[in-house]
């Protein structure tokens, strides 16, 4: 499947040019932002790890082997891509045990930068945000138009699509999810089950968001919407008064779309009509998610870009720095700016 089929239309029109992303790992740097004070004592050893050429699961397996402990004793907040230079936290459960010797885990692809004890393990999704530093090379673009587009993104945000990596190579995860949904079965292997359920859920969300981008109301609240703050999982219904809330213009409050689960859409008015229509079109996937025990949740439709800054180290290089909430994709920001040369089509996720 193509990018436009898996995501949807751009919000701001045609790209301002072309560029290459991820010519090397240093071109895509991700730092996990964790808002948890670590106590310095407890039965969990937290590790601040820098890795390149390894995804999060591979790094966890390496730490487990070096520590001589089962993989289930290793925890992390979010999944980071292999094709990047990333820094993130892991925790090791060591009740009554000394810190293990982890020298065997380290080489040029993995370095342990910090070790801290804490009383609790690191929970999935516990990080607050991810900081990105991206370097786009082989840039061929209209620089004034690119600068104007960046200012627009700073003021208005971008559609909060799930990025391409969620769906696997050529949408393979989604195709596999459809096959399981038709058979009304679930994969026995836990990681595969999680990956396919996430792909299906993400695709349905993207379908709804794509429809709203196409008509231009993805970033505007309307009666019947369910609204949520940027960093909150709770939501509330929008009436006429809520649609005039000044926090919408400040990019603190946003309309949301469905993360599919059991039951129908709790939205109202035109929003419910749209979400129900997508649900009918994709009934096998929607039913499969409900039968798998997924609960209906919401995700903001608009992605605010915090601390956005950019400069041009060379005439054909654009360097971007910004912070995104956990669970959001840096390349959905990039796709509103430029088309990527083929070597840069891989995406990097934050966390499911």
From Swiss-Prot:
One of its GO terms (molecular function) is RNA binding. SUPFAM superfamilies: Pseudouridine synthase. This is tRNA pseudouridine synthase D. Belongs to the pseudouridine synthase TruD family. PANTHER family: TRNA PSEUDOURIDINE SYNTHASE D (PTHR47811:SF1). One of its GO terms (cellular component) is cytosol. It catalyses: uridine(13) in tRNA = pseudouridine(13) in tRNA. Residues 157-303 form the TRUD domain. InterPro entries: PsdUridine_synth_cat_dom_sf (IPR020103), PsdUridine_synth_TruD (IPR001656), PsdUridine_synth_TruD_CS (IPR020119), PsdUridine_synth_TruD_insert (IPR011760), TruD_catalytic (IPR042214), TruD_insert_sf (IPR043165), TruD_pseudoU_synthase (IPR050170). CDD domains: PseudoU_synth_EcTruD. Pfam families: TruD. It comes from Azotobacter vinelandii (strain DJ / ATCC BAA-1303). The gene is truD. One of its GO terms (biological process) is tRNA pseudouridine synthesis. Its EC number is 5.4.99.27. The active site is at residue 81. Responsible for synthesis of pseudouridine from uracil-13 in transfer RNAs. It is an enzyme of class 5 (isomerase). It comes from the Bacteria. Keywords: Isomerase, tRNA processing. Coiled coil: none annotated.
């Amino acid at each position: 499947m193509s990018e436009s089929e898996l995501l949807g239309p751009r919000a701001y029109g045609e790209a301002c040019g072309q560029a290459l992303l991820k010519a090397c790992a240093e071109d895509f740097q991700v730092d996990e932002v964790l808002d948890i004070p670590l106590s310095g004592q407890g039965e969990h050893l937290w590790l601040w790890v820098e890795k390149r050429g390894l995804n999060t699961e591979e790094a966890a397996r390496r730490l487990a082997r070096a520590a001589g402990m089962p993989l289930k004793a290793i925890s992390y907040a979010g999944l980071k891509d292999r094709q990047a230079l990333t820094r993130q936290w892991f925790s090791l459960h060591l009740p009554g045990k000394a810190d293990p010797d982890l020298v065997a885990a380290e080489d040029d692809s993995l370095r342990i930068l910090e070790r801290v004890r804490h009383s609790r393990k690191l929970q999935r999704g516990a990080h607050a945000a991810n900081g990105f530093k991206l370097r786009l090379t082989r840039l061929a673009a209209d620089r004034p138009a690119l600068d104007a587009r960046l200012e627009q993104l700073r003021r208005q945000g971008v559609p909060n699509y799930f990025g391409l990596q969620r769906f696997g190579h050529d949408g393979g995860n989604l195709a596999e999810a459809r096959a399981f949904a038709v058979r009304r079965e679930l994969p026995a292997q836990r990681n595969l089950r999680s990956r396919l359920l996430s792909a299906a859920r993400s695709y349905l969300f993207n379908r709804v968001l794509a429809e709203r981008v196409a008509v231009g109301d993805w970033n505007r609240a309307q009666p019947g919407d369910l609204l949520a703050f940027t960093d909150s999982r709770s939501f509330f219904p929008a009436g006429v008064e809520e649609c005039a809330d000044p926090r919408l213009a400040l990019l603190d409050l946003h309309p949301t779309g469905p993360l599919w689960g059991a039951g129908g859409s709790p939205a109202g008015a035109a929003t419910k009509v749209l979400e129900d229509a997508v649900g009918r079109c994709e009934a096998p996937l929607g039913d499969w998610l409900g039968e798998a025990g997924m609960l209906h949740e919401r995700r903001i439709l608009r992605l605010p870009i915090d601390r956005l800054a950019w400069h041009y180290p060379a005439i054909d290089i654009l360097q971007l720095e910004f912070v995104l909430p956990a669970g959001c994709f840096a390349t959905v920001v990039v796709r509103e700016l430029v088309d990527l040369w083929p070597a840069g089509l891989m995406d990097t996720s934050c966390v499911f």
